[in-house]
Amino acid sequence: EYNPFGTNTQSLYVYFETDSAVKVSYTIHVKEDDIADFSRNVYQDEEYQKEHEFQVIGLIPDTENTITFYITNEDGSTDTKEIVYEMGSLYGEEAVQLDTDVKQSADKLEDGLYVVLGNDSPSMDFMYYYDNNGVLRGEVPLLGYRSHRLIFDENSMYYSISEKKMAQVNRLGQVTKVYDLGNYKLHHDYVFDENGNMLILATDTTQDSVEDIVLKLDVNSGEVTEVLDLGDLFGEYKKTCVKNSSDELDWMHINTIQYIGNGSVLLSSRETSTIIKVDNIYDGPVVSYMIGEKDFWKDTSYVSLLLNKKGDFTIQGGQHTITYETDESLADGQYYLYMFDNNIGISETRPDYDWSSIGLKVSSAVDGKNSKYYKYLVDENEGTFELVDSFKVPYSGYVSSAQETGDNVLVDSGLKGTFTEYDADHKAIVTYKMDYEKFIYRVFKYKFDGFYFEKSE
């Protein structure tokens, strides 16, 4: 049945039973020569089973799709069944085939689908799934605003569907719960802790300031609690800030949250170009330390919280999508932290600070030479951070994302409307270009193994 739950316009719901236990895969073929076949192995609870219920994704709009199901028995023999489905039109205006600039063999790309989050537009909002050929394989309608990332638990996928709502969706594409955040608006990011609670970046609409709250959502009960107000931790600094050009007191502008265990989180503050570690988030939050520019914080009581910069490099400016990464080769108390370093120097709420004095000379959203992928080694024992890897990427003063995927790095330069997957030597493999009205907010790659598709070994 075509898209019965309304959550992906390029999907089919499939159900059938077999006499013996089998596993299932499918291939979607269209007659258009420039669109390659799309093949996936279906997720099942058991490797071989008799009852089969799943979602086929990847149909091509406005054309006849030939879907071949491969039904494989435990002895390895395979039966096939073919259906033809003519899909109608997309809801949105997005391209079915992105413009691509292929620099190296596409075999070097990691497996997965590029999920384009927030191609901001005044009309209907969507999440898009594109394959490695730049072909659209999923159009996921939202109520409004944007999704910020996909997060998963054992049986569900979660994403934001409006400024005040999160959705829980199962493997079939059925919305199983919608969570309402009440007086709070979500923004930018959300993450699970080790107990399956969701931490969500938010604005308290009853307060004078924005984007400075963290909420806890219990996904079982739907209960929403405020666990952190940065105004409580940085009250003295908040008093010195002024409203920005949108007449908002966006004094911190937290744009990423990473949960790192034991009640500790890392927060990325775009407005202060600072990364903040907060401990005890559930019972008396305290700032453990910060990674930022000492000169920016020098006349405040918070300067003593800054880690020491080790080596000679320009600090991150207006960074996005900080990502916490552990490695067995590192000592306890050490970790990697990588990010999209927008390489912009601006704080509208602190207009007197001259970012160019510390090397961040560009304050324009679009007119910079380049942004960067930055990777720090943070050493909590020594109280230091050092730049261990970086490379230049197309400039975007705001939004954007970086994601390590396998040995590669995926970078979205949001205000350019492009995303590129780079190899382990930081050489571009393929760049994809989208039509966009304002920007592409983020692009992350997901394999969907264990969700839509079979778990990889």
At which residue positions do the language-model features occur?
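Histidine-/acidic-rich catalytic cores in large beta-rich domains
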Residues: 2-28, 49-53, 57-457
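Short alpha-helical hairpin
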Residues: 29-33
